[in-house]
Amino acid sequence: MTRPLTHALFVNSGILGQRTFARFIQNAFTGQQEGVRATQIVLTEGLTPAERVLRRVVCSRLWRDGWAGMTNLDFMRYRAEWNAGWLARKRIRQLEQSGARFDVLHFHRQATSYASLRRIRTTPTIISIDCTQRCAMQSARSRLEARTYAPNVRRDGDIFRAAQLIISTSRWAADCLRDEYPDCTTEIAIMPNPVQLDGFDPTWIEERYARATETPGYRPRVLFMGGDFRRKGGYDLLAAWRDGQLGQHASLDLVTSSPVESRFLSAGVAVHVGVAAHSPEWRALWRDADLFVLPTWDEAFGMVFQEAAAAGLPAIGTRINAVPEVINDGQSGLLVAPGASEPLIRALNQLIASAERRRDMGARARDFIVQSAHPDAYRRTLAAAIQRVANSTQPARTIR
C-alpha cells in the first residue's frame, strides 16, 4: 500500500548555524523523501528593500550593550525575534495566496513562529529548539537585565504549549523547557542536529597520525572556529596560548568573522577571516588540524563541536549547557570551565604532546557523531515525526 504523501513547510531563520540545517533540509527532502514533500522558507533570502529597511529600524539598538553594565534594556532581543516571526508569517501568507496547502509546519527555531500563534493552533506544528531563553538570562548581570527577557519567555511559552511536537537538540534544552514551563505538556523529542558527514573523510584520522609521527619536529595545528570571537572565548584562548608559551611547539589557526586585536597575537597564531562554511578552504582547515578548541562562554549546543567530531578531531570545550553532551570528557575531548586559563593551558598541552591520544580521542569522537547525528537517520526520524503529527489531527488545510 502506498504511503500517503505528507506536505511539510519548513521555516528557517537563515542566521548563523541555522543555514546549515536549511542546507540539510534542502538536500534530505529533495523531491519526495520518506513520504514527505518539503517546501522551505529561509528568512534571510529574497529580502525586499522595504523588508531590509524595516529590519534595520526594528532591530536597531536603542541601548548600547554594556551601558551601565547591562544589555538588552531596549528589548532588542524581543524586537529581533518578533521581526523574524513577522517575516515568516508574511512569507507563509504569500505561499497561501498561491494556493499552497500543508499538513505540517516546522519552525526552526522558535522565534520564527512568534507571529504565527493562531496558525499553530489550527495547523499541526513542530517547533525545533536548541535552548530556551535561559541562555540569554543566565548571562544577565542584574535582575533588571534578566527581566528584559520576560516578553520572550512568555511568547516562547505560548508557542510551546500550542505546538504538537517540540524537537530539542539536547537533553539539557529539553530539561530547561520542562523546568521553566511545568504546565507545558507538549511532547519533546531529543534529536541532536544532523551533520553532513560526507564533507569529512574518516581517513583523516590516520592521515594526521602519520603526519605527526613521521615528520621530524612536527608542530601540531590547533584550530579555533567561532564567529563572535570574544563570546566564543577567543581572547581567553589567546591569553592561554601566550601564557603557556604554546607557540614554541604548536600553531594556532583562528577562523572568525570578528576583527581580532593584533596586540593579543603571539607566536604561532594565524588569523583567517571570511572563510565560508563548507568551502574548500574551510574543509582544508578541518583536514589539516590536529585538535579543535573553543573555550566558549555562551553556547547552547555547539554544532561546531559536532563538526570537529565529524572531522575526527579531539575537542577542548567548556563545561556549559549542552556541550558535555557532545564532548565526552576524557574520552573524545576535554572540558574546562569558561575563563579558566590554567586548566585550558593544561588541556592544550596534554593534546599537543600526544599524537596517540589525539588519534584515539578523534576516532571515538567520529564514532559518536556517526551514531548520534547521521543525516540519513535524522531524515528518517524527522519524516516519521512529521507524518505522526500530521495524522494526529485533521488532514491538510489551506494555511490561515
PLM regions and their residue ranges:
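Aromatic "clamp/platform" in nucleotide-sugar-dependent glycosyltransferases that forms part
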Residues: 297
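Nucleotide-activated donor-binding/catalytic signature segment of Leloir-type glycosyltransferases, i.e.
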Residues: 256-287
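Membrane-proximal helix-turn-helix segments that form the acceptor-binding/catalytic region
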Residues: 146-166
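A short, well-ordered alpha-helix in the C-terminal region of glycosyltransferases
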Residues: 350, 357-372, 378-384
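Conserved donor-binding/catalytic core segment of Leloir-type glycosyltransferases
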Residues: 207-232, 238-242, 252
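Short hydrophobic beta-strand element within catalytic cores of glycosyltransferases
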Residues: 314-317, 327
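Carbohydrate-associated surface elements
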Residues: 172, 194
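Conserved acidic donor-binding segment of nucleotide-sugar-dependent glycosyltransferases
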Residues: 329-330, 334-341, 350-356
